[in-house]
């Protein structure tokens, strides 16, 4: 069983055991009318838009430094991030909906709930906790699930980042006409990354969508490797959580977009 399949099985058990219903019943609703739109930010930006991530660990990384997360969010916004991603999976990534709820009020930037969503109830919890965006991972969803969850999230006034790992999944996303598409550079079987995976997947990309490269981006040289694929932005977690000088590092990543 792959790590991803294991995580999905875990999410199914949480749904069956009432975990998400309990969250919906106990989390106070967070009002996020002041949140900016990430798509609007992309449309206005001549430079790459950055989704800066808050994470504590992952199945492959356990030694991320502890940070003052409120300060981290503040620094992300101060030094040019266009959105913040917050992991809400507790078991594998050390996140929580309570963390999302606490941090979303610290910024006017759009906030992405990054989790493994397979049911509308998870979307309800994300929204109640203060997310303005959600992630849908094509690899773990059927075509019907993808369409239904995407349309439900849009109906809840949430922006949706739809994540693909190969060209076949990209074609599936085009069928639901998702505006915002994430290209994950991680091999789902081995959980290793290759940033140039973005170039391969986007060779024959369609116009009128926005493309975000995710995972494996550690420095400006990685960004230069994929800039000419025509990406509109980056999602970066580990490199930012390890960085002790965001004031220099983050602006270096915001390179001028190259439309291919």
From Swiss-Prot:
InterPro entries: Aldolase_TIM, Indole-3-glycerol_P_synth, Indole-3-glycerol_P_synth_dom, Indole-3-GlycerolPSynthase_CS, RibuloseP-bd_barrel. One of its GO terms (biological process) is L-tryptophan biosynthetic process. Keywords: Amino-acid biosynthesis, Aromatic amino acid biosynthesis, Decarboxylase, Lyase, Tryptophan biosynthesis. Its EC number is 4.1.1.48. Pathway: Amino-acid biosynthesis; L-tryptophan biosynthesis; L-tryptophan from chorismate: step 4/5. It comes from the Bacteria. It catalyses: 1-(2-carboxyphenylamino)-1-deoxy-D-ribulose 5-phosphate + H(+) = (1S,2R)-1-C-(indol-3-yl)glycerol 3-phosphate + CO2 + H2O. The keyword Cytoplasm does not apply. The keyword Magnesium does not apply. It is an enzyme of class 4 (lyase). HAMAP family: IGPS_B (MF_00134_B). This is Indole-3-glycerol phosphate synthase. The lineage of its organism: Bacteria, Bacillati, Bacillota, Bacilli, Bacillales. The gene is trpC.
